[in-house]
Amino acid sequence: YSPTLAVAGGIASQHRGAVELCQAVNVLNAVAGNVGQTVRFGADMPTGDGYAGIEKLLAALDAGQVGVLLIHEANPVYALPASLKFRDRMKKARFKVSTATYYDETAAECDLLLPSLHSLERWDDANPRAGVYGLMQPVMEPVFPGRHTGDVLLDASRKLGGVFSKFSAPDFKTYLRSAWTGRASDEAAWRAALARGGLYQVPAEAAAVTPTGASFSAATPAFDGDGDFVFVAYPHSFLHDGRGANRPWLLENPDPVTKATWSPWIELSAATAKRLDIRRGEVVRIISPHGEIHGPAFPYAGLHDGVIAAPLGSGHTEYGQFAKDRGFNPLDLLGAPDAGSGFMPYVSTRVRLEKTHQYQEVATTEGTPRQLGRGIAEAIPLVYAKKGMTVLEALRAEGHAEHERNTELEVDAILGWREKQVEGRKLGNYAEVHPSWGMTVDLSKCTGCSACVTACYAENNIPTVGEDQVLRGREMSWMRIERYWEGGEDGEPLEARFVPMLCQQCENAPCEPVCPVFAAYHTVDGLNGQVYNRCVGTRYCSNNCSYKVRYFNWYKYNEKSWPEPLNLQLNPDVTVRARGVMEKCTFCVQRIRSAQHNAMLEDRELRDGEFTTACAQACPSDAIIFGNRRDGNSQVAQSSRDPRGYHVLEELNTRPAITYLAKVLNRVEA
């Protein structure tokens, strides 16, 4: 018996039949014998009031029963469907107070603004799930003269007296400490909780559950409207529900699937686009019984023909310079949440589509959508991976024709040239034995989430360039996630493959010999160095780079990206580049040199794994491994010897320092 698992959740279950769907999935798990195996029942998750609380508030507002409305770090004017008319109904409160950290749509409607401290500037706690209690403490002084909302409420309680007199703590930190008495009874326990960032209790034993027979309604969910398409609003991969819409790092980070940046788009299936003669970038109007939106069309082969989809997160009328007046808000098309379940009706509306005969180019970073036989994002079936086959051996086993990449004469010439190159480098400091830094990237673990990309922005002071420059192909991200489509033809399933692409730190780097001022050079430990003070901006290195991972500063991006106080986020260990300078991935050389310096001070050798690059540190699936390839026992050296390993564009003889591990395909043939 092999345990299975049925799961309900995500956007697909956000409709008026959501509760019935969850019940049906629970029944399926019980019938399949999964209860007690892959499904266990323990402590309930902590939950808020949900939509029921919103309904009570709206009823009280309509009845004129709200004297003071305090809204703390929430933006219901934007985050609720426009059909609820929360903006108009909140005006019925006699006095409205906002304690937001941003001037958002809700704050703009309030009578008093009390800016709250940022989460990095204040004390706080959280209970995200049963048994987990997070404890937050400030890591920096407040940048602006705001006050902790807790301190404001404590001051108000002391002045009001009466039932509020029990809140007598002089400040919120003291109140928080007293509230944690039950969890951290003494000073030692409190300090331990601070050091760990909270309290993480041992999960309770799974409760014994005996499924019993039950009945429930299974009516077909009703839809608002009678349009030809079902509309699906889904959280943006980076902006989520709109809370990240004023962060340029997230706006300029391409969506993993569409590779679109900055502004939202409207997805429709490729077949629907062909039938209606709609091309990418054509502005279409989507109309529902509750409202309408306008946006550029984005045909997508992975979408159902009867569905139109759009990401949440855009369409703000306030919230900051980067979020304001950018795109549309899909919530304008939706009705009220289901009163019984409280689920947002993300899949409960039928819409009509109209052409506007206007055009808006979608700012994408997509190159070629398919590999075109270049072997960039390799994959190997599980049956061959289990046998320890290489990608080439697996292709032979499947009957693919093998093409000779280089003739015997060419191979001899290449090998002889390389030997001369290596011998020629053995001068001065290059004659000594040094580490050889390298990386492996496991494509079976990479999900295309782009956490590595954002980490690289933060670590290396990379500027954002804006939508107009992205349209011109001038993005500055040192690391990009390339997405290639496989299949999707003749009934084959459509598959997306993701490949993190960065400077390969080639041993035979084509960028180095073409630089007329030796700004691009090879370091003793195998890195392709870049001397910014030497660079005169000829861009020859970029033209000669086989992987297109060098980026040129066309403007003074740094001046626009970090006006005060945003300059506080800059990494002091990394130079901020100016206009006319070429830049690229350095394998976080500042981290390498810092670790080497610390090891020298402690009179010892560098230890494998004691430091890593920002991208490897941020990867949630541990797809990236960094280390010294010359150390045969290092994790990177061992993983690079995996039979699945290959180098991108290996036939060019650039000898990259990055080894990719082919994605394992676990398919069940019909």
For each predicted feature, which ranges?
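Active-site phosphate/pyrophosphate-binding segments
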Residues: 1-61, 183-190, 194
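Short acidic (Asp/Glu) and glycine-rich catalytic loops that position anionic groups and cofactors
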Residues: 2-7, 35-41, 66, 129-138, ...
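Generic, well-ordered alpha-helical scaffold segments in large soluble proteins
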Residues: 10, 24-27, 31-34, 57-64, ...
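Short glycine/threonine-rich loop-to-helix capping motif typified by GTGT followed
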Residues: 15-21, 84-85, 539-540
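A cross-kingdom feature strongest in bacterial/archaeal respiratory oxidoreductases
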Residues: 43-144, 161-162, 176-477
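Phosphate/diphosphate-binding loops
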Residues: 83-104, 138-157, 283-289, 296, ...
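Non-catalytic, well-ordered alpha-helical segments in soluble enzyme domains
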Residues: 148-170, 175-178
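Non-ligating segments of multi-cofactor redox enzymes
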Residues: 338-670
